[in-house]
Amino acid sequence: MLTEVKNQLKVMFLSLKYNIMRQMTNKVTFITNIVFMILNNASFIVQWIILFSIKEEIGGFTIKEVILLWGIAASTYGIAHLLFYKAFDLSELIINGKLDTFLVQPKNVFLSVITSDTSISAIGDLIYGYICLIIYGITIKNFLLFTIFSITGAIIITSLTSILGSLSFWIVKSDILADSFTNAMLNFATYPGNIFKNSVKIILYTIIPVGIANYMPIDIILNFNFISFVYIIIFTIVITILAFFIFNKGLKRYSSSNLMSSRI
């Protein structure tokens, strides 16, 4: 099993390498996309600087902690769109019967699909995330935790988006749900979790688990908690297994009719 996992990871990174090389054929566009994404992200921090000039704390966060929050959000989004870009187009691929080419490849279909393309601007998100970490204060501990949580956060958002996208095997318009979920995750991830109360906070730790992907990691970086750390790892593993299961379940339906004529 370990050999199979190793081979799948090797294939995934080879796919990433070739996708990036393909995008680098136009180096000016390649670099411009990355730089503009960094500048785009940085522009939002200006708004927070203005807010913190009026009030020292917002939701228990200082400006440095908000910058760290933005760093986690950006790097999470960056890794997800760099490695698993097609997970965010999964509904479109299923609805339009574009999985056929992946079915004949001698590797895991789900991984083949979601790693078949990359977003170059996501490199800018990833770089920006680590710039935020440097501004916050980089130490070996902070760097390791930040990297781990960027990966777990990326896997969580990719898995949940894939689950919603996989519903297109049964429901035609599930792409709307998947897009709404992705946008909600991104929007909530850039605000301190403590400003949300009661039912909204419950939703952010369950239905839209931005609390697990972003808020809990910030708390752990600020004040390490081993139980919370293990909880995030377990949640990430469970949601990943669920994403594979639902996609493979739906794939059997797709294999029987690639036109998906029997969907609702």
Could you say what each language-model-derived stretch is?
Residues 1-136, 140, 144-264:
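Hydrophobic transmembrane alpha-helices and immediately adjacent juxtamembrane helices
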